[in-house]
Amino acid sequence: MLINYLMLLFAAMIIRSFADSGNAIETTSPEITNATTDIPAIRLCGPEGDGYCLHGDCIHARDIDGMYCRCSHGYTGIRCQHVVLVDYQRSEKPNTTTSYIPSPGIMLVLVGIIIITCCLLSVYRFTRRTKLPIQDMVVP
């Protein structure tokens, strides 16, 4: 801990001697006088891009030269020329009221298993109660 205090004291002495000697570094920066205008990263093409994109908007990107298409929903491709085919059965949300109701066949099987199990248990208990005690067999 004493070493940390000595290092801190030594660093403060070096900084003070450097500042007193007149060798201080000027850290102020000159003011910027010319104003810069922000160019949006993506902008619409304008009249030169009319008809370029078949199903979407023609755009210019700031970093890339050329025209590009931002496709409307349901279209894809370089010029939005391809239709995206959607499988409607997979895209629909499941009907929550019917998706959690078990089918009648499954219910019948479960009820049948429960009834058979109850019958077997009752037969087992009945035969266990009425069983005659085993008599010791004596051999003459």
UniProtKB/Swiss-Prot annotation:
- Name the Gene Ontology biological process terms: epidermal growth factor receptor signaling pathway; positive regulation of cell population proliferation; positive regulation of mitotic nuclear division
Q: Which UniProt keywords apply?
A: Disulfide bond, Early protein, EGF-like domain, Glycoprotein, Growth factor, Host membrane, Host-virus interaction, Membrane, Secreted, Signal, Transmembrane, Transmembrane helix
Q: Which part of the chain is the EGF-like domain?
A: 41-81
Q: Where are the transmembrane segments?
A: 101-121
Q: List the disulfide bonds.
A: 45-58, 53-69, 71-80
UniProt keyword annotation of Metal-binding present = no
GO (cellular component) term, any one: extracellular space
Cytoplasmic topological domain ranges are: 122-140
MF term (GO), any: growth factor activity
Ranges per topology, Extracellular: 19-100
- Summarize the protein's role: Stimulates cellular proliferation (hyperplasia)and mobility around infected cells to promote rapid and efficient spread of infection. This effect is beneficial for virus replication in vivo, because poxviruses replicate possibly better in proliferating cells than in quiescent cells. Acts by binding host EGFR, inducing its dimerization, autophosphorylation and leading to activation of several cellular pathways regulating cell proliferation or cell survival.
Q: Which family does it belong to?
A: Belongs to the orthopoxvirus OPG019 family.
Q: What is this protein called?
A: Pro-vaccinia growth factor
**Where does this protein come from, organism-wise?**
Vaccinia virus (strain Ankara) (VACV)
